[in-house]
């Protein structure tokens, strides 16, 4: 048989016509105001690694192949939760090289090829790719926007295929900023308990919630196995260190769950010793760092609301560091290209996130505030002029 490529991969790996246009336009424009900034590193607010190097560097050359991850680092993650009102035993904390790897471990642990995962729409396209690479299928449930607020369409959870194994919650959601309420959580848990699903909560943006909504660590989950995913990428703005975690409540799966997760993780042992060593002192400063990031985000949210006062344009952002803007009558791909061509402003078009209607764009709340404000005023002028 002729060698070919795995059916896990898309048949067409080339860039879409839109991205070819966008790339060509970037080359022509040369410089632009970037409203797609995805990390504090690129936004000029990095974590001060020099402040923790002396505390960590002595362990850079240590090799301790624990399938759950270094105990001292798991203890640091447990303290991270405790500082925020959560309580997890270190035995139920699994360290990974990234949130993506945490997904991969869970998919291998809980699913068989052909099984299904329920994912939120609008949502981040990476989730579909991660599932496909494990021979899994994704099916949508929906967040709807009305009166300037995003809400779970709990009825859409009922349209699930029989092979569903996991309900995936992203809270705060990327890109809408929706945060699960207790009522929405209870509806999800009720469905998961009845249908024998696990719940995976991607809360990488969980440190950045602005409306006082609790994180669901202490809410009732009945007998449902629940996994909470996070990492250094967002909590201390350091994606370059490649360390994530899952903290879990085994529910009906009991003690065997830990054995199963460790079995899969032990096959990879992906996290480096420097990442383990640095995570411990970095997490001890995570609340201080959070305050720096949150100031930038809140300043930009204030600017956003002053420029676009209407909730029809900017629905409420409960958390995260992105905001979704809707311009009725616009085509989001056309608007994205027009903003770059005419004003040197780079945004993300809504179709990347499967928004249900046209006219959505997504902007980062990490961009330096004066540049952010200037760009928003140009966007407002451009969209109101049409």
Regions found by a protein language model. Give the residues of each.
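N-terminal small-domain helix-loop-helix segment of the aminotransferase-like
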Residues: 11-98, 105, 282-285, 346, ...
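Helix C-cap/helix->beta junction micro-motif
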Residues: 29, 134, 194-195, 343, ...
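Generic structural signal for small/hydrophobic residues in well-ordered secondary structure
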Residues: 35, 77, 93, 117, ...
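Conserved core of the PLP fold type I
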Residues: 61-191, 206-220, 227
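PLP-dependent enzyme catalytic core of the Aspartate aminotransferase-like
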Residues: 79, 87, 158, 338-347, ...
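Hydrophobic residues in well-ordered beta-strands that form the structural core
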Residues: 119, 140, 201, 347-349
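Conserved core segment of the aminotransferase class I/II
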Residues: 222-298, 383-384
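Conserved glycine-rich beta-strand-loop-beta hairpin in the small C-terminal domain of fold type I
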Residues: 276, 280, 296-305, 313-326, ...
């Amino acid at each position: 048989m002729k060698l070919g490529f795995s059916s896990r991969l898309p048949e067409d790996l080339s860039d879409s016509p839109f991205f070819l246009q966008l790339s060509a336009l970037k080359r022509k424009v040369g410089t632009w105001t970037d409203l797609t900034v995805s990390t504090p590193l690129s936004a000029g607010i990095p974590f001060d690694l020099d402040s923790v190097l002396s505390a960590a560097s002595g362990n850079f050359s240590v090799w301790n192949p624990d399938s759950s991850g270094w105990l001292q680092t798991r203890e640091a993650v447990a303290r991270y939760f405790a500082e925020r009102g959560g309580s997890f035993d270190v035995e139920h904390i699994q360290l990974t090289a990234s949130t993506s790897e945490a997904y991969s471990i869970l998919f291998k642990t809980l699913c068989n090829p052909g099984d299904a995962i329920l994912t939120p729409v609008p949502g981040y396209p990476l989730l579909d790719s991660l599932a496909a690479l494990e021979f899994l299928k994704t099916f949508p449930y929906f967040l709807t926007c009305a009166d300037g607020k995003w809400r779970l369409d709990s009825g859409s959870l009922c349209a699930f295929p029989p092979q569903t194994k996991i309900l995936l919650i992203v809270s705060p959601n990327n890109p809408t900023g929706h945060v699960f309420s207790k009522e929405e959580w209870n509806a999800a848990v009720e469905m998961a308990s009845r249908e024998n699903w696990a719940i995976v909560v991607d809360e990488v943006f969980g440190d950045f919630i602005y409306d006082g909504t609790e994180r669901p660590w202490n809410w009732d989950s009945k007998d449902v196995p629940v996994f909470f995913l996070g990492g250094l990428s967002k909590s201390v703005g350091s994606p370059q260190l490649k360390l994530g975690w899952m903290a879990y409540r085994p529910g009906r799966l009991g003690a065997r769950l830990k054995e199963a997760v460790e079995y899969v993780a032990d096959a990879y042992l992906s996290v480096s010793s420097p990442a383990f060593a640095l995570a411990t002192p970095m997490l001890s400063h995570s609340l201080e760092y959070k305050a720096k990031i949150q100031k930038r985000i809140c300043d930009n949210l204030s600017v956003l609301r002053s420029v676009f006062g209407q909730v029809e344009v900017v629905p409420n952002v409960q958390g995260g560091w992105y905001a979704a803007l809707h311009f009725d009558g616009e085509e989001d791909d056309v608007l994205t290209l027009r903003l770059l061509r005419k004003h040197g402003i780079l945004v993300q078009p809504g179709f990347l996130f499967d928004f249900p209607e046209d006219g959505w764009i997504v902007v980062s709340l990490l961009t330096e505030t004066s540049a952010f404000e200037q760009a928003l005023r140009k966007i407002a002028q451009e969209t109101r002029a049409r």
